[in-house]
A protein has these predicted regions:
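Sequence termini and other peripheral, non-core segments
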Residues: 1-54, 329, 333-444, 473
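Terminal catalytic/cofactor-binding subdomain
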Residues: 1-130, 137-141, 177
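Loop-rich catalytic cores of soluble enzymes, especially ATP-dependent carboxylate-amine ligases
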Residues: 5-10, 105, 116-135, 139, ...
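A long amphipathic alpha-helix within ATP-dependent nucleotide-binding catalytic cores
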Residues: 253-265, 307-310, 314, 560-564, ...
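ATP-binding N-terminal substructure of ATP-dependent carboxylate-amine bond-forming enzymes
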Residues: 422-488, 492-495, 514
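C-terminal active-site "lid" helix and adjoining low-complexity regulatory extension at the edge
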Residues: 641, 666-678, 692-696, 705-757
């Protein structure tokens, strides 16, 4: 089969580049000094019997972080970033993730505990590995790179070739070619990407096989890494030969199980190798890669892209390697792994030739300038080893003082970075914060998540066979369809609540600006609220707390409201303090005092300067991707200033509170203060009743209450309902400006999956 010719003739270059990608990353949990910890796997991650993202490898201290498969490699790296951030923020304060592959700060072997898994056989298997290979070699960590050739490409290629009549046999032959050519040329990736030049002497036991001060390219990929006994040789001439030789060594007792055979390529798609002959290989797992200590998550996107196109090159090559070539590749692997990382490799000519073939392939399949630049940069590293990861690593180790010290330093640095925006997942920063918080908790607890539509905040969440859909963090099938429609229409909301016996302020509705302005005499001198009939998040609302006294100001407020809707309400202003109640089901989970947007004068700065200073708080942003919203100085704010006899250029006296908004929505720059524990229980019960009246499961209820410490009475002097909101914001409760955090996303998960342990 002439794969190159078929791709060129039938213009399959784009399809050839597609596939699915996944990454598994092993790392040790360590203390601040780089010593491997002996603590149990954190219970906050739930059970390892089902967790899809956060597992343990050999040891209880050895994390294994697993991304879901993605069609875009960039999405796989985003998931790796998110899982990493969740893990780092969930570890005890004193624990870190070691960023280097070779272990440092090893405890005596009898203190290293195999992963304590629920499946007894899994524990016994690890104990077997300890006896055969020793625990220290099992503590080596790395990256596993999973790649599935595009199914569509395989099917199209099968239809065009004439060598194979069976599609499964064809698929298996394609993956065997990929695996064997990879094993033949894997040394190239070791030269370019290896990062294990040394290890602490304790790793070797009594005597190190390396000379004092000797550096190598990759101890992990050398004979001193985790390798099987020399006599265990698996035949790669065909998949059938591969299966039979693997079964032979298991039957003879040389291997306890098929998975004990360690190879830098593992063919995946079935529990037993023999099943691959009938079912076909689904994807290949490449297990060669050292952790890149200069990448916070162990691998960069550029290197992941390079690996992808290197794998495509292994398919592109016309020759198909058999067992003899695989053995040659193993010899070259060990040779390059033990070379001095400061010197060019003895195999430079072959390495350059393969990457030049990659560049020719890129041109033929029109891969683009970006990946071409990445490959050219790698090609140049054959002539300059200092540009490789190892070249940079040697200098970094010298600067830090030791391998272990560098690892500890980077581990602390990467954990600090993960906490810089502790309220967000940096890889999914374009999603709203409530969805990011929910994603965090879903990853932490081990539920399968699929992002159906990132821009629309739509998730599919699965636990076992139980599937739920979530939009915007808390919109689910548990709410009636009619509920948000009722709450979106403020007139209907008030009528429904009034019929249910709840206190609501009087209001008048208008359908045009002129109609509303004509009724100005009815409201002159009265404290009123002007707002769109259908709104959420406080949009288009103006409040005249001291009474409206100017027709032009009234008109302007009416015009602002009409920008948000075709109908506008003018409502009596209720005296008291506004509180937001977050209700889920039959319980009020959180109560928040939202202080309207304000600044406090210092006698020096103007209002504008005070606003700029307050907006510099890192918690303030656009309000959907930050817990607090930056304060604006728009029309509504300037109207509010005018009521106080101020302008943006006024200089308030020291301690003077300047109100920039009358409404207290966080989405318009307000401050959030948790009042859950201070609020009288009677008001919490009222909020639950209001939610039930709306037919909702999740609701944000806004109540005006003059005195939160006194029990509710059945009149407007005691309390009144301002609004009921669908899809209420959760971030202001999770990350309040002041007070206790209420992790509402966890309550949403419990509502959706009550069976979750």
């Amino acid at each position: 089969m002439k794969l190159q010719q078929l791709i060129k003739t039938h213009q399959l270059g784009l399809l050839f580049q597609q596939g699915k990608f996944g990454i598994e990353k092993e790392s040790q949990r360590v203390d601040a000094n780089g010593n491997i910890v002996t603590t149990a796997h954190p219970a906050v991650f739930g059970s390892r019997s089902y967790h899809p993202y956060i597992q343990t490898d050999f040891a209880e201290s050895q994390l294994e972080l697993i991304t879901p498969p993605n069609e875009k490699l960039s999405d796989t790296l985003r998931w790796l970033s998110a899982i990493h951030e969740v893990t780092l923020r969930s570890l005890p304060e004193s624990e870190y993730i070691f960023p280097l592959s070779m272990p440092a700060g090893l405890s005596p072997e009898d203190q290293i505990q195999e992963a304590q898994l629920e499946n007894k056989w899994d524990v016994e298997y690890r104990e077997h590995l300890s006896k055969i290979y020793g625990k220290y070699k099992q503590m080596v960590s790395g990256i596993h790179y999973n790649f599935q050739i595009s199914d569509e490409f395989v099917e199209k290629l099968f239809s065009l070739q004439q060598t194979y009549s069976d599609p499964i046999e064809f698929r298996n032959a394609l993956y065997m070619k990929l695996a064997n050519n990879f094993l033949r040329y894997q040394w190239i990736l070791v030269y370019l990407l290896a990062a294990t030049p040394e290890v602490e002497s304790q790793y070797f036991g009594e005597k190190s096989p390396l000379a004092a001060g000797q550096l190598v390219r990759s101890l992990r990929s050398s004979p001193y890494g985790y390798v099987n006994a020399p006599h265990i040789v698996i035949n790669h001439d065909s998949l059938k030969d591969y299966v039979e030789s693997l079964e032979h060594f298991v039957a003879s007792g040389d291997l306890l199980a098929e998975k004990e055979f360690y190879s830098n390529v593992r063919l995946r798609g079935a529990k037993k190798a023999r099943e691959l002959l009938e079912k076909g290989v689904k994807y290949a797992e490449f297990r060669l890669f050292d952790l890149n200590p200069f990448a916070p998550y162990g691998i960069t996107l550029e290197d992941a892209q390079f690996i992808h196109y290197f794998l495509l090159t292994m398919l592109w090559l016309e020759e198909t390697s058999g067992q003899q070539a695989v053995e040659q590749g193993k010899a070259y692997l060990y040779q390059v792994a033990l070379e001095d990382p400061r010197a060019p490799t003895a195999l430079q000519t072959e390495g350059e030739a393969i990457l030049k073939t990659t560049l020719e392939m890129l041109e033929q399949i029109q891969a683009g300038k970006e990946i071409e630049a990445i490959v050219k940069a790698k090609l140049a590293q054959f002539a300059d080893p200092s540009k490789t990861i190892n070249g940079r690593l040697r200098q970094a180790i010298e600067k830090a003082g030791s391998y272990k010290a560098l690892g500890a330093q980077l581990a602390q640095q990467y954990k600090a970075q993960a906490f810089e925006r502790f309220y967000a997942l940096s890889a999914f920063d374009n999603m709203e914060l409530s969805t990011q918080a929910l994603l965090f908790d879903l990853i932490q607890k081990g539920l399968n998540v699929e992002i159906l539509d990132e821009n629309d905040q739509f998730l599919a969440v699965k636990f076992g066979d139980h599937l739920e859909y979530v939009k915007n963090g808390n919109m689910t099938s548990h709410d009636q369809y009619i509920s948000p429609l009722i709450m979106e229409n403020k007139v209907v909301t008030k009528k429904v609540l009034a019929k249910a016996g709840f206190n609501v302020p009087k209001s008048v509705e208008f359908t045009s600006v002129e109609q509303a302005v004509a009724h100005y005499p009815l409201f002159e001198g009265k404290a009123v609220v002007i707002k769109p009939k259908s709104t959420n998040y406080g949009l288009g609302i103006t409040i005249f707390q001291q009474g409206v006294t100017n027709r032009d100001d009234f008109r302007q407020a009416i015009e602002i409201a009409f920008r948000e809707d075709k109908e506008v309400m003018v409502e009596d202003y209720l005296v008291g303090t506004e509180y937001r109640f977050f209700v889920l089901g039959d319980e009020t989970l959180a109560v928040l005092l939202r202080v309207p947007a304000n600044v406090i004068g210092d006698g020096v700065k103007t209002v504008r300067e005070l606003v700029d200073a307050k907006n510099a708080d890192p918690l303030r942003g656009d309000g959907s991707r930050s817990p607090l919203k930056k304060i604006a100085l728009g029309e509504i704010e300037q109207l509010q200033l005018k009521e106080q006899g101020l302008t943006p250029e006024s200089v308030p006296t020291s301690g003077q509170i300047v109100q920039l908004r009358a409404n207290s929505n966080i989405s318009t720059g307000g401050d959030s203060i948790d009042m859950t524990d201070q609020m009288h229980e009677s008001y919490k019960a009222l909020a639950v009743g209001i939610t039930h009246a709306m037919g909702a499961k999740v609701c944000g209820v806004d109540l005006i209450i003059p005195d939160l410490s006194q029990p509710a009475r059945p009149n407007l002097d005691s309390w009144g309902v301002i609004e009921a909101n669908f899809n209420p914001m959760m971030m202001m409760h999770i990350f309040p400006y002041q007070g206790k955090s209420r992790r509402l996303t966890q309550n949403v998960i419990k509502m959706l999956f009550p069976e979750l342990p």
